[in-house]
């Protein structure tokens, strides 16, 4: 049986949860994996909870990450840690704004990409795929600050290794 990597991204409406899952799915596709993605928007337009699941591997059958099976949980808003912690498998990795020193980012709107930067250092996916996916999924004027945020997150990941 081939391993499927399960990732959950959680936050509030307007924080870029879904854009983050778009970038992540793009990276896995570029790496040649079968990718499935799902999202739960809730009251996202009013700042409510938003969750995105990304699963990739050689054969992925369902887009939803089963409870207790997430290898990684990326949380953009600290209040969303506890409501989503049950998604992590034992030994899974939680990545929060504190992990990437969010106060040092070029903009708070780059937090989603900074968390992806941290994740990128923990996954065996080529860095060039991450950079290409960021460029492909964001407007050109946002590339410099998001590429900076990605590298900040990537450097911060040394503290997250399981």
Per-region residue spans from a language model:
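Active-site cofactor/cluster-binding pocket
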Residues: 1-162
